């Protein structure tokens, strides 16, 4: 559409009305007279006839059809999830400002409504967007669209009977609400609605100008993709499926398969879905978490896979622990794994130069590598590498060797340099000669560089002839700390084909004073390379890298001949960096002799200025980037070697493994490392807690005193830090209403014993069941009173138990009531005074836990209220429901109902009302409950609980009698 500006007009006046014939005819079916806005209704003003008089560019809005209306019968319903899902038939009229709905068709005159007040009037300016829902609605042939308001109110779903009416309504909304986005998924009209695109194209152009109706113009600018609008289609479009609720069908949309299966096998009905679909989603999330494997940070998982992501592979604790053990064991092996022998033996010096000392941690490996020198052969590429290195070293004397290494991508991460070995006698023999002939050596090094390529084949042949001779040569002792090799050859064998010159035995060029005897070792060790079948293109990154550090180090080593010589210049300090990087990596030669005198053996590595030390640190930092060739040999390197790019999942696993090792180390400082098996005798299994089994045992050295042993397999514990947490809480929470902690023992690295006092009376659950659920209010008040005192002690220490229930409240033979099982406990801090972790047992959980909201100590008060109902009715609420339905009822029903409240006193009902208050703000604290009239007036002494333990005594007598009878019969 050609824009009309005020500068194009000579006489400013209102545009004339459109011709009468241009108006679209109304639809007899209710399409409305304003449905058609043809191209003849458009006013095209020629700029030639009007002239151009100003430079203003403010466009004039031509809303020709604003006085027209669209009307017709439609079916309407709200998009609310709590409303009726019937489609209501209404007569809809869209005016300039409102969208009106009538129960009956209004009388119309001059395009205005003269009927009764509309049933619903919706201002057009409140429309945020219109979502198209084709092929859906009241009937199979209906088309629907959804009007989404700006004020977050319920959306309005409108179903139109025919496709023509559907398109007419869209045209009307486009005309009346030009700024409203119309399309699927709030992203404008897609190409699946061809009418809107055809409207843009068929409304034509005049004289080559794309002059269309306001309807089509607005569509082209705000809705359409492609075409003459110049707007491209969406880029990188993604459709994220999320869980929702379709009120039309009454079903959820986008449910994962796991959730679908849970709903199909649950007792949650369609009425439950429609009543509170949000609660159903919350329950599904919660139930999946407590039965899956999704451990989040800071989430205790001491119970069967609490807080785990829904993953069928992780549901089996044994499978989880075995997999984790394998990964952890592999990681530990990776740390202690020595470099491959071929890695150490693949290096050949590029020239006859002194060798750096062997790092301490590789001396034994070098010795073992030296034993494989009987095989012959060499790597042709080694000579090429050495040649390139020697040439670069000669031509770039003033350039930092570290930069050369970085350009070759051959840096390897470094660790701290090990102490050098003590010097040998051979070092003293040749150090003076090297010092005297240093200038001559520099001159001949250039000659070696020039003649290296020509002599390559000759040296290879000579080296093969001398390979066996090298095996038979006498050897001299190495340094005291080198474990695997005790002798080194006294005669230098020929070098590998490289840039270095022929040696004394292989060439006519005699350089007796330039060759350090320690080079003999390295030249011999390379025989192992070819016999192992190593390809030249697959040479380990360490092997390639060592060539440069070796050459760069040789010059510095010569300049450190005298023990009192000044520190080398900065260029030589930089030359030390590659050697240090390589030496720390552990891929050095079998050279153990420093070039210093015997009385100062530390100088080759330690004779550095402060700047040299800084250079070493820089090398360690820069060399963390691995070379490409290091990746293939990564398994043979120590764990601290070249860092291969790892995924976030791998890094997370490594952090978990390191964390587990740290936890085990921490645990060893908390527990007793003595073997407990000789101290105790297991009698029988007494029960099972959140993090392990509980056994009845006897202390052998304490007159067979009965104690309880909680035995835990650490490998089966997804969160080992919780075990430390439980032990520390029990140690720090000595109280008469908390089970007394005696000691703990760690057997190996995976078995933990926690020794606690034995409660002969058993759990409160057993007492309730074996007394025919006939606890009177006085006994209930006494048990609640004793339990509250223990909870008060914990809450004063800002500790939440989070698993209060009858199973975790124990009684002894005297009626003492004590809290046990701290596997789910958590400590609140000033920085974190609330928790949101989903832990506990579903039937005793507070609503805020099920809904995954933040909570504090008052979740224990709710659980205490549920435990009180247990003592009254024999079971917690919803116990007969399957867990998913129970969670739904907890989240939606709020305070549970009593089965027979008329049988209870007002005091206990008031006590329950403040314990089971859904609003946490009004739920009582332990301090308030201890002051409650039910506790103050109804509770008694613990001796009054003794009758509840008669069943235990009768049971013990029966067992003794049965045992005596069996013994007598056997005799």
Swiss-Prot record:
State one Pfam family annotation.
Pkinase
Q: Which residues form the Protein kinase domain?
A: 680-935
Q: Tell me the segments the record calls region Disordered.
A: 1-40, 201-221, 292-517, 554-653
**Which sites bind ATP?**
686-694, 710
Output compositional bias ranges, type Gly residues: 23-37
Signal peptide residues on this chain, from the entry's feature table: none
Q: Reply yes or no: does the keyword Nucleotide-binding apply.
A: yes
Q: What class of enzyme is it?
A: transferase
Which CDD domains does the entry mention? Answer: CRIB_PAK_like, PH_Cla4_Ste20, STKc_PAK
Show the catalytic activity: L-seryl-[protein] + ATP = O-phospho-L-seryl-[protein] + ADP + H(+); L-threonyl-[protein] + ATP = O-phospho-L-threonyl-[protein] + ADP + H(+)
What positions constitute the catalytic site? 803 (proton acceptor)
Compositional bias segments (type: Low complexity): 307-326, 365-404, 449-482, 554-578
Please list the residue ranges annotated as the CRIB domain: 231-244
One GO MF term: protein serine kinase activity
Sequence ranges of Basic and acidic residues compositional bias: 434-448
UniProtKB keywords: ATP-binding, Kinase, Nucleotide-binding, Serine/threonine-protein kinase, Transferase, Virulence
| Pro residues: compositionally biased ranges | 491-500
Query: Residue ranges under compositional bias (Polar residues)?
Result: 423-433, 617-630
The record's EC number reads 2.7.11.1
Q: For the PH domain, which residue ranges apply?
A: 67-178
> Which InterPro entries does the annotation name?
CRIB_dom (IPR000095), CRIB_dom_sf (IPR036936), Kinase-like_dom_sf (IPR011009), PAK3-like (IPR051931), PAK_BD (IPR033923), PH-like_dom_sf (IPR011993), PH_domain (IPR001849), Prot_kinase_dom (IPR000719)
Family indicated by similarity: Belongs to the protein kinase superfamily. STE Ser/Thr protein kinase family. STE20 subfamily.
Q: What does this protein do?
A: Essential for virulence and morphological switching (hyphal formation) of C.albicans.
Q: What is this protein called?
A: Serine/threonine-protein kinase CLA4
Gene, per the UniProt record: CLA4
């Amino acid at each position: 559409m050609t824009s009309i500006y005020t500068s194009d007009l000579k006489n400013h006046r209102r545009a004339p009305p459109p011709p009468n014939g241009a108006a679209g005819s109304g639809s007899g079916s209710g399409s409305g007279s304003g449905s058609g806005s043809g191209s003849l209704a458009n006013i095209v003003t020629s700029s030639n006839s009007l002239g151009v008089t100003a430079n203003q560019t403010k466009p004039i809005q031509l809303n020709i059809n604003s006085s027209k209306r669209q009307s017709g019968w439609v079916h309407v319903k709200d998009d609310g999830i709590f409303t009726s899902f019937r489609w209501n038939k209404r007569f809809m009229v869209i005016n300039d400002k409102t969208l009106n709905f009538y129960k009956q068709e209004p009388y119309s005159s001059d395009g205005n409504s003269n009927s009764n007040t509309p049933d619903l009037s919706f201002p057009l300016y409140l429309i945020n967007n219109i979502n198209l829902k084709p092929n859906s609605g009241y009937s199979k042939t209906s088309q629907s669209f959804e009007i989404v308001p700006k004020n977050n109110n319920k959306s309005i779903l409108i179903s139109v009977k025919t496709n023509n009416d559907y398109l007419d309504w869209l045209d009307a909304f486009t005309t009346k609400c030009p700024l409203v986005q119309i399309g699927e998924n709030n992203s404008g009209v897609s190409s699946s609605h061809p009418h809107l695109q055809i409207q843009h194209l068929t409304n034509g152009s005049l004289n080559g100008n794309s002059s269309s109706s306001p309807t089509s113009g607005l569509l082209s600018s705000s809705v359409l993709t492609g075409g003459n609008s110049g707007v491209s289609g969406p880029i990188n479009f993604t459709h994220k499926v999320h869980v929702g609720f379709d009120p039309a069908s009454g079903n959820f949309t986008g449910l994962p398969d796991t959730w679908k299966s849970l709903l199909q096998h649950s007792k949650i009905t369609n009425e439950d879905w429609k009543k509170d679909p949000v609660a159903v989603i919350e329950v599904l999330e919660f139930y999946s978490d407590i039965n899956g494997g999704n451990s989040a940070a800071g989430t205790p998982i001491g119970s069967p896979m609490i807080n785990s992501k829904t993953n069928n592979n992780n549901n089996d604790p044994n499978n989880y622990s075995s997999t984790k053990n394998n990964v952890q064991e592999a990681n530990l092996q990776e740390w202690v794994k020595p470099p491959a022998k071929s890695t150490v033996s693949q290096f050949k010096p590029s020239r006859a130069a002194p060798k750096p000392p062997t790092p301490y941690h590789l001396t034994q490996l070098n010795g073992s590598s030296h034993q494989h020198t009987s095989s012959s052969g060499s790597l042709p590429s080694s000579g090429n590498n050495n040649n390139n290195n020697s040439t670069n070293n000669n031509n770039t004397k003033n350039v930092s060797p570290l930069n050369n290494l970085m350009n070759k991508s051959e840096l390897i991460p470094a660790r701290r340099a090990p102490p050098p070995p003590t010097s040998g006698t051979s070092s003293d023999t040749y150090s003076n000669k090297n010092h005297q002939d240093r200038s001559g050596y520099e001159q001949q090094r250039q000659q070696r560089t020039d003649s290296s390529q020509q002599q390559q084949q000759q040296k290879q042949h000579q080296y093969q002839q001398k390979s066996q001779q090298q095996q038979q040569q006498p050897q001299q002792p190495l340094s005291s700390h080198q474990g695997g090799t005790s002798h080194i050859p006294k005669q230098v064998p020929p070098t590998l084909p490289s840039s270095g010159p022929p040696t004394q035995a292989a060439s006519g060029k005699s350089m007796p004073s330039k060759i350090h005897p320690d080079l003999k070792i390295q030249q011999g060790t390379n025989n192992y390379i070819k016999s192992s079948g190593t390809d030249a293109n697959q040479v380990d990154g360490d092997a390639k890298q060592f060539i440069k550090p070796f050459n760069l180090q040789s010059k510095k080593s010569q300049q450190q001949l005298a023990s009192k010589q000044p520190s080398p210049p900065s260029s030589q300090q930089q030359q030390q960096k590659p050697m240090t990087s390589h030496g720390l990596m552990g891929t050095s030669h079998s050279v153990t002799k420093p070039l210093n005198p015997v009385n100062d053996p530390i100088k080759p590595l330690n004779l550095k200025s402060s700047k040299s030390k800084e250079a070493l640190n820089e090398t360690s930092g820069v060399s963390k980037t691995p070379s490409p060739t290091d990746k293939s040999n990564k398994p043979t390197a120590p764990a601290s070697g070249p860092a291969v790019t790892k995924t976030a999942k791998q890094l997370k696993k490594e952090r978990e493994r390191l964390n587990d090792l740290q936890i085990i180390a921490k645990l060893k400082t908390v527990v007793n490392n003595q073997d407990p098996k000789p101290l105790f005798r297991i009698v029988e299994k007494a029960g099972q807690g959140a993090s392990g089994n509980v056994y009845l045992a006897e202390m052998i050295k304490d007159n067979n005193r009965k104690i309880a042993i909680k035995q835990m397999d650490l490998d089966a514990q997804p969160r080992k830090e919780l075990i430390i947490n439980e032990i520390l809480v029990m140690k720090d929470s000595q109280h008469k209403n908390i089970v007394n902690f005696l000691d703990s023992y760690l057997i190996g690295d995976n078995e933990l014993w926690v020794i606690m006092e034995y409660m002969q009376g058993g759990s409160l659950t057993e007492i309730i069941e074996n007394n025919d659920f006939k606890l009177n209010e006085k006994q209930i008040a006494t048990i609640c009173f004793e339990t509250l005192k223990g909870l008060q002690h914990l809450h004063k220490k800002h500790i939440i138990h989070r698993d209060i229930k009858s199973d975790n409240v124990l009684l002894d033979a005297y009626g003492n009531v004590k809290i046990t099982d701290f596997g789910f406990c958590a400590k609140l801090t000033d920085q974190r005074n609330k928790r949101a972790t989903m832990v506990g047992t579903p039937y005793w959980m507070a609503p805020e836990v099920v809904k995954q909201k933040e909570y504090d100590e008052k979740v224990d008060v709710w659980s205490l209220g549920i435990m009180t109902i247990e003592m009254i009715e024999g079971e917690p609420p919803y116990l007969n429901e399957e867990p998913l339905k129970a969670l739904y009822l907890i989240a939606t029903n709020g305070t549970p109902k009593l089965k027979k409240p008329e049988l209870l006193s007002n005091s206990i009902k008031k006590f329950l009302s403040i314990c089971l208050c859904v609003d946490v703000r009004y739920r009582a604290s332990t301090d308030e409950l201890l002051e409650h009239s039910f506790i103050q007036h109804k509770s008694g002494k613990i001796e009054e609980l003794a009758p509840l333990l008669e069943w235990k005594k009768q049971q013990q007598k029966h067992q003794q009698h049965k045992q005596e009878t069996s013994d007598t019969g056997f005799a």
